[in-house]
């Protein structure tokens, strides 16, 4: 790559292969590496016109996966007209490769009061989104990633379209502050979870369409978004393959595809993508030799044997009450908390309907440090859904039809959003939030004389869970598990 950048072997360099290598290289998120690649992007020509190479590239094999979210928004020309593709991209060179909005420095930025207000609103939005996802079944969503994507989209929205989008997304800050707020929250999350989290944003634009510098500048500086040209008009299938390839690389192959064949149309002009990859281990891993099948109660009179992870004595934060149990499990260094809420006197559906950001915040304050015997089921939860109906019902209907105003993106054609797809996956295992383990009879630790027995925290009924970054007070994922064996 260095040789190519110096111009010594450009004649033998396939640009799409270099781009593939760049995205698959484990070092590609390092600022110095990104700077080198950015400096030679224009010399490699139009990086987005050809499908990415299918080489396996360099892949990290040591990561443990906690969860992934990927969201895709697709904008099409609402006037039905298409623009003639040009042989080369009109995207300015300086926007050819995204630059990180993470910032630098060893100190964590402290969220300002207005940013905490937006984080609280994001939590309320996430809970509402979960309520509208696969009711009564296992489900998981990343409200944070959805909110981030909608904030990116809002950078190009104007008039009633911008107002409706902000209302539906529960943005509590004015447009002039919303991008700074999300940049700041993203910085806190990324710096806190450095080495455990990868956050990637990209915008894919029809070749020949000239986006406004102001729009691209917001996406580049506030969201670190890469901007790439694609030929939706003449090769929508190739565009699907390219975006799916990006998806697979950003999610380390866990989500190999988000777009089905035919999902992109010749009328498509812009696609926004966002991927969140988390890798974290428990502060104290569960001993796999103690894991065993136990009953998980699907209802008061029906149960199913399910693999459970068991720790006979663990220091936790928890709330044990007649009506509700809450358990906090931390990753190494306390950087991330997975919070489990188990209602005992009402159904999970009823409990979920009563949840709000304010109630969750109040419940979290009631948890106290304690010693506990923990029984937690192993589980994997995955959800894939369209957000179009959800956002329409909440006031954002104009952005999906010919009333949409996205003149902040371009004046060359009328744009509207075709659909927004959201996919999320979370795995919980003994070592952290992944990894397989054998099961065997548990070993019981005897209680020393005079010491009270640990509180039993048994997550053996349908439960609500939340993956929480405490420094920014951001819910990265919220979900429900009604049957961990399903």
Q: Over which residues does each language-model region extend?
A:
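Low-complexity, intrinsically disordered or signal/transmembrane-proximal segments
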Residues: 9-12, 16, 22, 56
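Short, low-complexity, charge-dense intrinsically disordered segments
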Residues: 10, 27, 38-45, 51
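Detector for small/aliphatic-rich hydrophobic stretches
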Residues: 19, 54, 62, 66-73, ...
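Aromatic (phenylalanine/tyrosine) cluster motif
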Residues: 22-23, 33, 37
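Serine residues within intrinsically disordered or low-complexity segments
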Residues: 28, 35-42, 60-63, 82
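Non-catalytic, conformational "gating/processing" segments within enzyme and secreted inhibitor domains
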Residues: 136, 175-344, 361, 365-453
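C-terminal or internal capping secondary-structure element at the end of a domain, subdomain, or sheet
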Residues: 463-486
């Amino acid at each position: 790559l260095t040789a190519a950048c110096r111009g010594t072997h450009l004649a033998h360099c396939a640009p799409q292969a270099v781009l593939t290598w760049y995205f698959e290289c484990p070092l590609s998120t390092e600022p110095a590496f990104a700077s080198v690649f950015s400096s030679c992007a224009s010399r490699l020509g139009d990086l987005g016109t050809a499908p990415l190479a299918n080489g396996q590239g360099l892949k990290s094999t040591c990561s443990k996966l906690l969860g992934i979210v990927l969201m895709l928004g697709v904008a099409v020309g609402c006037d039905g007209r298409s623009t003639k593709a040009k042989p080369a991209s009109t995207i300015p060179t300086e926007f050819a490769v995204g630059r990180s909005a993470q910032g630098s420095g060893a100190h964590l930025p402290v969220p300002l009061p207005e940013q905490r207000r937006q984080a609280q609103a994001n939590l309320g939005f996430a809970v509402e989104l979960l309520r509208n996802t696969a009711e009564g079944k296992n489900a998981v969503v990343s409200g944070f990633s959805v909110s981030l994507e909608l904030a990116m989209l809002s950078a190009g929205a104007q008039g009633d379209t911008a107002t409706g989008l902000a209302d539906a997304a529960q943005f509590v800050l004015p447009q002039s502050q919303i991008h700074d707020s999300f940049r700041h929250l993203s910085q806190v999350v990324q710096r806190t979870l450095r080495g455990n989290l990868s956050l990637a944003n990209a915008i894919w634009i029809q070749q020949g369409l000239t986006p406004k510098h102001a729009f691209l500048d917001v996406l580049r500086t506030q969201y670190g978004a890469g901007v790439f040209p694609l030929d939706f008009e003449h090769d929508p299938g190739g565009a699907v393959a390219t975006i799916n390839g990006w998806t697979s690389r950003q999610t380390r192959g866990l989500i190999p595809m988000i777009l089905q064949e035919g999902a992109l149309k010749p009328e498509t002009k812009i696609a926004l993508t966002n991927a969140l990859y988390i890798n974290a281990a428990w502060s104290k891993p569960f001993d796999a030799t103690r894991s065993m099948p136990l009953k998980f109660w699907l209802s008061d009179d029906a149960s199913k044997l399910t693999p459970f992870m068991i720790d006979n004595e663990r220091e936790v934060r928890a709330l044990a009450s007649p009506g509700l149990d809450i358990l906090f499990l931390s990753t190494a260094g306390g950087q991330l908390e997975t919070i489990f809420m188990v209602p005992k006197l009402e159904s999970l559906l009823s409990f979920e309907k009563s949840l709000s950001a304010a109630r969750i915040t109040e419940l979290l304050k009631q948890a106290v440090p304690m010693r506990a015997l923990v029984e937690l089921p192993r589980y994997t939860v995955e959800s894939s859904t369209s957000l179009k109906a959800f956002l329409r019902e909440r006031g954002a209907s104009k952005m999906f039809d010919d009333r949409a105003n996205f003149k902040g993106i371009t004046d060359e054609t009328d744009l509207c959003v075709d659909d927004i797809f959201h996919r999320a996956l979370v795995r919980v295992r003994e070592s952290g939030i992944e990894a397989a383990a054998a099961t065997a009879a548990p070993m019981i630790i005897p209680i020393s004389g005079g010491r009270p027995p640990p509180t039993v925290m048994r997550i053996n009924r349908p439960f609500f869970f939340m993956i929480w970054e405490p420094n920014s007070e951001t819910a990265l994922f919220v979900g429900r598990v009604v049957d961990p064996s399903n």
